From Swiss-Prot:
Belongs to the glycosyltransferase 4 family. MraY subfamily. One of its GO terms (biological process) is cell wall organization. GO terms for molecular function: metal ion binding; phospho-N-acetylmuramoyl-pentapeptide-transferase activity; UDP-N-acetylmuramoyl-L-alanyl-D-glutamyl-meso-2,6-diaminopimelyl-D-alanyl-D-alanine:undecaprenyl-phosphate transferase activity. This is Phospho-N-acetylmuramoyl-pentapeptide-transferase. Pathway: Cell wall biogenesis; peptidoglycan biosynthesis. Catalyzes the initial step of the lipid cycle reactions in the biosynthesis of the cell wall peptidoglycan: transfers peptidoglycan precursor phospho-MurNAc-pentapeptide from UDP-MurNAc-pentapeptide onto the lipid carrier undecaprenyl phosphate, yielding undecaprenyl-pyrophosphoryl-MurNAc-pentapeptide, known as lipid I. It is found in: Cell inner membrane. It comes from Nitrosococcus oceani (strain ATCC 19707 / BCRC 17464 / JCM 30415 / NCIMB 11848 / C-107). Its EC number is 2.7.8.13. One of its GO terms (cellular component) is plasma membrane. Its main location: membrane. It comes from the Bacteria. The chain crosses the membrane at residues 21-41, 71-91, 95-115, 133-153, 166-186, 197-217, 234-254, 261-281, 286-306, 337-357. Its cofactor is Mg(2+).
Length: 358
């Protein structure tokens, strides 16, 4: 929005041309989202105290003391991301609208889930059937839109990391891949969001890394040099990634152990979907699988636990997702959180290394 204002003012003062630079607008997106989080956060948390989070009766006993902690704090993240993006991004860029709409719609699904938990005082929330139905509708809708509006072949190709010039033409399978990446990423982050700050910092790290991929993919010179596909509209996603980083760090200020507020599904489902659609837009789905390894392992632990119990009557882990397994083994919550953060830092660095190792 402000890009149009600065474009007009540049007619009278050339100094306003500085706002054309993506890097500056990305930094301003980070700072804007951060300031919004710090300003809006405290009063929002005070209001949310009237709607405390019910705690699962079958969860770790150490979590019982968290009953009543305000939830739905993800609304703060969405407000900060949306405001910062709308202020500093080029709103004529279709990718900006795609990532914003997907993030907010998945946040809407999460809001309904959280609302049902709070209204009925039931920690289970929205039934899985309805949750997956609406997630599927949104994901398939955006996948079809992107498939039919693709302007270059690279937009629907699967890029294989670590190998130079290896791209698989997906054709119609692009829609299926996009669906699984967006829905899978959304639910993976949601499963990981079980400890204070556990999900939000990895989301920030992965989102920031995807911003680097977006900047490189949107610049023809960098894309050619690094051997990644050039996607003309991808560069503007750096502003959204900046807003995500700022909003995530701002929320972490209140969500760090011991948490003053929980993200809730409104935040976790939205952030996971944002990472998924970002990876799709910059054609780095496989790299997302690497960088988001913590999310992947958490999800796989649940799948293995359910499958093992149904097939053999035995559980592989003491409790799933995996972070609860370590809690029950006696690890203090902060230790689990920080070690998962460290693993994410390592995985993100490996993901970024794919830019050069080909």
């Amino acid at each position: 929005m402000l890009l149009y204002v600065t474009d007009y003012l540049a007619r009278f003062d050339s100094g306003f041309h500085v706002f054309q630079y993506l890097t500056l607008r990305a930094i301003l997106g980070v700072l804007t989202a951060l300031v919004i989080s710090f300003v809006v956060g405290p009063p929002m948390i005070r209001r949310l105290k009237f709607v405390g989070q019910p705690v699962r009766s079958n969860g770790p006993t150490t979590h019982l003391c968290k009953a009543g902690t305000p939830t739905m704090g993800g609304a703060l993240i969405l407000v900060a991301i949306a405001a910062a993006t709308l202020l500093w991004a080029d709103l004529s860029n279709r990718y900006i609208w795609v990532v914003l709409v997907v993030t907010l719609l998945f946040g809407g699904v999460g809001f309904v889930d959280d609302y049902k938990k709070l209204l009925a005082k039931d920690s289970r929330g929205l039934t899985s059937r309805y949750k997956y139905f609406w997630q599927s509708v949104i994901a398939l809708g955006v996948a079809l839109f992107l498939y039919f509006t693709a302007s270059v072949a690279a937009e629907t190709e699967l890029i294989v990391p670590f190998f130079k010039d290896v791209a698989v033409n997906l054709g119609g399978y692009y829609v299926l891949l996009t669906y699984f990446v967006v829905v899978g990423s959304s639910n993976a982050v949601n499963l990981t969001d079980g400890l204070d700050g556990l999900a939000v910092l990895p989301t920030v790290l992965v989102g920031g890394a995807l911003g680097i991929f977006a900047y490189a993919a949107g610049h023809s010179g960098f894309a050619q040099y690094l051997g990644i596909p050039y996607i003309p509209e991808a560069g503007e996603l750096v502003v959204f990634c900046g807003a995500l980083v700022g909003a995530g760090l701002g929320f972490l200020w209140f969500n760090a152990y011991p948490a003053q507020v929980f993200m809730g599904d409104i935040g976790a489902l939205a952030l996971g979907a944002a990472l998924g659609i970002l990876a799709v837009l910059v054609r780095q789905e496989l790299v997302l699988f690497i960088m988001g390894g913590v999310f992947v392992v958490e999800t796989v632990s649940v799948m293995l636990q359910v499958a093992s119990y149904k097939l053999t009557g035995r559980r592989i882990f003491r409790m799933a997702p995996l972070h609860h397994h370590f809690e029950i083994k006696g690890w203090p919550e902060p230790r689990v959180i920080v070690r998962f953060w460290i693993i994410t830092v390592i995985l993100v660095l490996i993901g970024l290394a794919t830019l050069k190792i080909r």
